[in-house]
Structure formats: C-alpha cells, structure tokens
C-alpha cells in the first residue's frame, strides 16, 4: 500500500511569474506547479487560466506530485477522471483527491460510455496521455472516441529518449500518434518536450479553440527538442523556493 509521496522540486514557483511566456488569467494565484514538466502550466496557458474545466488523465500515477491534473482541480475548480492500472496507486490517489481515479486497463477501456454517463461536453478541455510502454499509450489513444469528442489541449507521452538508452523505442509510435492527431485537425505546438534533457512528450492543441495569439507565444520549429522550462518561460533559468514554500498548496 502506498502511503506517501516523494519530495519533488517544482519546475515553476511564484518567483518565476514574470518570466511566463503567457501570464494567463489568475496566474498570480499559482504558487507552484505540480506536473513533472509543467504540463499543468501549459494547459492553463493555452486556455488562459480557464476555471471549471474538464480533463481526462490517462496514466495518473500519484495524486499530487508529478500529476498533470492536481493544479487544475485544486486551484481552478476543474472536474475530470483519471486512469491507472496499479490498484495500490489508485487507492492512494482516491484518498487524496476530490476527482477520482479508475483502476483499469486504459488500452481496453470504454471511454465513450463513461463520457456519456458523466455527461462530459463534446469539447473536453484537456487530455493527458502518459502510460508505459509507448505502444500502450498509442493503444489508449486509439480507444478514445476522437470522432465524437474533441480535446482543447493534449499532452502526449512519446518516450523518444528511450531510443538512445535501450533501443526499445520505435519511432513509428510517435509517427502514428501524430498522424491520428493531424487527421483530426489538431495542431502540434511543441514537439519532443524534454525533462532533464530527455525528450518524451508532444504537446497539441485544437486550433479552433485555443487563441492563435497564445499559440504563437509558444510555437517554435527551429529546434528538435525543447526543455520544459524553455517551453513555458521566456528564458531557461528558474528559481528554487525554500522547501516550506514548495510544500504550500
């Protein structure tokens, strides 16, 4: 049984507010981020600090630390659902979160039925896809009812970095995911988002929903990979707050 979360230094703290590429509505209320690579800050940036949004998080892992939906729920009143295969992780998650996590195999789950049961809007605000291994993430993507539901912002794990570590990664998985997103009218804002030098995610948006002026602040095509701090900040330096400040919610 999991009963604690590890300490984790956030990628964003309030001291970095002045360096945000886009100071979204109520960004001054965010003292720290919780996602591993500032996916939460990217979502809030693209949707200009939207309140009361809806998310779908496939691959939840922990309830707070390195979680993509916690900040959205905690500070901006979002509702949504998370998915995780590990039963002990789900039990721990549900002890600490208002919006619950479902224990299931994300590659076979009937998402459409759940969306209908919960009366989710046809335009869902955020989709986080992050499960292991990469082909499982792709399989989960293919199970989503993409012809009937759209997502305003998508963060999609590709694990490109694995190609240089164990040779396990197959670039076809990233290519196939891109083909799926592009065929449904999504726009790639940042490719190969990196964490500590390891490229592992692509970030997409629905250009019919996200303001073109905001997209323009983040789009960059002259580099193969970008560190997450570079994606969100106007420069790559960021502050470290005292541990007492970091633990504040």
Set out the residue ranges of the language-model regions.
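Conserved amphipathic alpha-helix within the SDR
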Residues: 113-120
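Conserved acidic-Pro-Pro-aromatic motif
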Residues: 70-71, 76-79, 122-129, 133-248
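SAM cofactor-binding core of SAM-dependent methyltransferases
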Residues: 30-112
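Acidic/glycine-enriched edge-of-secondary-structure segments
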Residues: 21-33, 100, 123-132
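Membrane-proximal basic amphipathic "stem/tether" segments
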Residues: 1-31, 228, 232-249
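Generic detection of long, well-ordered alpha-helical segments
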Residues: 10, 32-37, 87, 128, ...
